[in-house]
Amino acid sequence: MGRGARVPSEAPGAGVERRWLGAALVALCLLPALVLLARLGAPAVPAWSAAQGDVAALGLSAVPPTRVPGPLAPRRRRYTLTPARLRWDHFNLTYRILSFPRNLLSPRETRRALAAAFRMWSDVSPFSFREVAPEQPSDLRIGFYPINHTDCLVSALHHCFDGPTGELAHAFFPPHGGIHFDDSEYWVLGPTRYSWKKGVWLTDLVHVAAHEIGHALGLMHSQHGRALMHLNATLRGWKALSQDELWGLHRLYGCLDRLFVCASWARRGFCDARRRLMKRLCPSSCDFCYEFPFPTVATTPPPPRTKTRLVPEGRNVTFRCGQKILHKKGKVYWYKDQEPLEFSYPGYLALGEAHLSIIANAVNEGTYTCVVRRQQRVLTTYSWRVRVRG
């Protein structure tokens, strides 16, 4: 994840990048942006767990605050799922912290920040998260790493970090579970802001961690401007989970009630009287799961022909599109099985301006299509069907 508007190499789950930052931030022309960033941010969602045995402690007379916005008017889908809809097969996830940041934050503060980020998701979903010792097995593995870390030098689709003021973090889609933070950054508890004294950006760990956790759960970037999973969430400062993320989780994991008393509460009229609480705990009983009509997948012109490629498992495959017509100022759009591909996903595929590279495996099997458009006119279309040979 990063602060810039650049398309990221989303970790095998994802990451956001900031490219417009650098050493020249002392320029006075950036003062308005710095003042804006200094005002961004909000405290993390308070811890609150609704276990089956804690019903009496919920205190329905006082509705706990929630970050979920009210109902929205019907609109088009803005969240994005992974092309293969990768997801976890259980909701009780464990995580371990393999390394801590070397700048500013202590291990204790780091644990507090990560716990707050996990609560943002557990408070609005069936997921629960529990930290385990570093030597124990876990679903999620979190670490703060230097530029060259793990297998980034030998993996074609897992990129290395780029030092300060570049990529902040990246995460891997399920079931990999890796969440990597750039140890060159200056992580803090509190809003992202620029430090004139240190001459560096101080980055809100809770905010970035919550974004990367969304990727680790299977969500890609949202097109909703105020979504936590938006590409520029760090720059814009939106720290609350939007309805977009909840709809994405519902489509990926199903719309589930979190308490066994939800049906009873719904019959007593709590769906209207305690709408926010019920939307968080009892979306199925109150029929809050899908409040707008889900569209069909993005339409793509049928390619005149589709080439089938049988590829050995593990091989890197590259498709090239529109090389001869780029001078006509056309824009290239990529699709997998008719679902639009907007970003790179390290560990799965790398998306360039006019080329697409994938690692041949069971997840990446399917039909890839590129469409070159100039405004509303389609200039050309190519399609490849990939089958993996074991």
Swiss-Prot record:
Binding positions for Zn(2+) per the UniProt entry: H211, H215, H221
EC class name: hydrolase
Annotated ranges, domain ShKT: 255-289
Residue positions of the active site: E212
Membrane topology category: Single-pass type II membrane protein
Record carries keyword Endoplasmic reticulum: yes
Cofactors (names): Zn(2+)
Entry note: cofactor: Binds 1 zinc ion per subunit.
Domain of life: Eukaryota
Pro-piece positions: 1-78
Tissue: Predominantly expressed in ovary, testis and prostate.
Stretches assigned to the Lumenal side: 41-390
Transmembrane segments: 20-40
Localization per Swiss-Prot or TrEMBL: Endoplasmic reticulum membrane; Membrane
GO molecular function: metalloendopeptidase activity; metallopeptidase activity; zinc ion binding
Sugar-modified residues: N92, N148, N232, N316
Post-translational modification: N-glycosylated.
Annotated disulfide bonds: C255-C289, C262-C282, C271-C286, C321-C370
Spans within the Cytoplasmic topological domain: 1-19
The Ig-like C2-type domain, residue ranges: 295-380
Keywords: Cleavage on pair of basic residues, Disulfide bond, Endoplasmic reticulum, Glycoprotein, Hydrolase, Immunoglobulin domain, Membrane, Metal-binding, Metalloprotease, Protease, Signal-anchor, Transmembrane, Transmembrane helix, Zinc, Zymogen
Record text on activity regulation: Inhibited by TIMP2.
Protein's job: Protease. May regulate the surface expression of some potassium channels by retaining them in the endoplasmic reticulum.
Annotated family: Belongs to the peptidase M10A family.
Description of its domains: The ShKT domain associates with, and blocks several potassium channels in the nanomolar to low micromolar range. The relative affinity is Kv1.6 > Kv1.3 > Kv1.1 = Kv3.2 > Kv1.4.
Name assigned to this protein: Matrix metalloproteinase-23
